[in-house]
Amino acid sequence: MATCADILRSEFPEIDGQVFDYVTGVLHSGSADFESVDDLVEAVGELLQEVSGDSKDDAGIRAVCQRMYNTLRLAEPQNQGNNQVLLDAPIQLSKIMENYDCDTKLPGLLKREQSSTVNAKKLEKAEARLKAKQEKRSEKETLKTSSPLVLEEASASQAGSRKESRLESSGKNKSYDVRIENFDVSFGDRVLLAGADVNLAWGRRYGLVGRNGLGKTTLLKMLATRSLRVPAHISLLHVEQEVAGDDTPALQSVLESDTIREDLLRQERGLSLKIAAGRAEGSEAALLAEVYTKLEEIEADKAPARASVILAGLGFTPKMQQQPTREFSGGWRMRLALARALFARPDLLLLDEPTNMLDVRAILWLENYLQTWPSTILVVSHDRNFLNAIATDIIHLHSQRLDGYRGDFETFIKSKQERLLNQQREYEAQQQYRQHIQVFIDRFRYNANRASQVQSKLKMLEKLPELKPVDKESEVVLKFPDGFEKFSPPILQLDEVDFYYDPKHIIFSRLSVSADLESRICVVGENGAGKSTMLKLLMGDLAPVRGIRHAHRNLKIGYFSQHHVEQLDLNVSAVELLARKFPGRPEEEYRHQLGRYGISGELAMRPVASLSGGQKSRVAFAQMTMPCPNFYILDEPTNHLDMETIEALGHALNNFRGGVVLVSHDERFIRLVCKELWVCEKGSVTRVEGGFDQYRALLQEQFRREGFL
């Protein structure tokens, strides 16, 4: 029998993930509230009407609600009467007892503890209506509701310094360095950092690196929310959420991020109006002169030009800079959030994977721009070349601690290897010394003449510092299954293809490209140039307006979307996710498949929502490779992956026996995998014979012509 979730997915295939989570949460938590289908229509009908657009009228929405209401009633436990239910299959008690683990909660209990986060603004009306209904009926009965999935939140604690507290409270602390010592960060029961120290010197640019899931993003959030003590006089900005869409033009939105300038302009307008109306007092004229002086000091008149340069560098055309923010997609609004942060120039700028939202051109511009950044930056990035370009220092998060290194990423790699080698040598030397002393103690322990020497040696052992063996990070190894028979070309090609959604805006004209099982093709180009559209044409998800797509009859494509997280059910475990996608296989097979991509042990059983961005990507890879494709089409596969996994992914693709076409902005990854480089621009795709070096040189020359360098 179909569940309410199944009905929602079948009737509204385009339903937003947050709306889906909210509606299913209402259905399950408020099922006791619904005495009739009218109650259910009142609770979620209006929301479903918005989701359906014009595809369903009121009667259609009511019919869907009737199906879900019937499903809820059938799912209720029947404690009275002798109702008989026909089972789908016989129950084998012996197998149930074999699989039952007394220490493991039953699935039904687990679901009660799960929840989903919902966009409160978007669903405010529906929530208010449901709340009123629940309050009205609370006097009649006690409702048994299951709570929505609330993810664990991070917490931080740190040792306080009386001296720093006194300086802070007295206002005498004028330093812009950030020093946080002996602090802990936890995420639920997991300890991410223990007794850690972080020192951010003013004007330095720090790259924060480490494996997926260790707590880099959490550390940024702890700093941004000041859960870790950052001096109050230090302004900071954390680029995390996209800009809210409204009627404000993009350029004006950036200008408004400078609150000091906006406040001065507001004062200037108010004072000028008073003076013009003849209502000003003598002191207000002096105050206006003071405001003008301050505006001149911060070069307020040059602000629009500076904001425009930042927006242009991030890919906003002059026309786009005048568009209302509500007209931009989520990716462009994230760029807008980055532009606002760059324009505001905070004392401490916190960036979390800024290159994920950018194309190669914008990344190169950002590298150049940040190299002259006047204050402090802490950036989480897995883009090796980006860190080499902008970082003056590297902070390595591992083993629940933070280690600092001077220099860019390549310098960090060399220094880390030397440090580990020295630590190993010191550990081995001490172990050898301990063994030497222990041999003496064991030999003369019962010799009365040597008793004093034995005691001396024992004290010597006790005083030796306890050195731990070097904690080496495990090597990441990925392998794509390739147990398939190779076949002859042509494999996949587009011939003279035209494509557009609107005839007035042609995306591709007479596009001709081809790929075979030996291909290692990387597609680059500015955002909006049509890279993802071309991938969908190659896959057959989009049909050409004119022209032909040829695909070999044995071709089996595996597709990785840059929006893969949106396509995962975040409320179930990775094992359950694969079981739903590929039913009928033993659990060990799902676990083995996930283990290939580093999702093993308890990670495989945790809700996908609780995994880090990189771990979610690994789950998506496990799902993509389960059917053993012979050709991969990958759209930004390195987003959120740590450097070791990116490296392993590159080697896995090189060893794969099938074909690969991918879109990426990661320079090192492109150089590692790419045999052909295609540039997507102006409605066509061009092969660059000189590879990435030639493409980078073309972009740098373009920057010089446009005055960015």
From Swiss-Prot:
Residues modified as Phosphoserine: 155, 157, 161, 283
InterPro entries: AAA+_ATPase (IPR003593), ABC_tran_Xtn (IPR032781), ABC_transporter-like_ATP-bd (IPR003439), ABC_transporter-like_CS (IPR017871), ABCF_EF3_subfamily (IPR050611), P-loop_NTPase (IPR027417)
Modified residues (N-acetylalanine): 2
Any Gene Ontology biological process: defense response to virus
PANTHER family: ATP-BINDING CASSETTE SUB-FAMILY F MEMBER 3, ATP-BINDING TRANSPORT PROTEIN-RELATED
ABC transporter domain ranges (all copies): 178-424, 492-707
Binding site for ATP 2: 525-532
UniProt protein name: ATP-binding cassette sub-family F member 3
Key words of the record: Acetylation, Antiviral defense, ATP-binding, Nucleotide-binding, Phosphoprotein, Repeat
Superkingdom of the source species: Eukaryota
A GO molecular function held by the record: ATP binding
Species name: Rattus norvegicus
Binding, ATP 1: 210-217
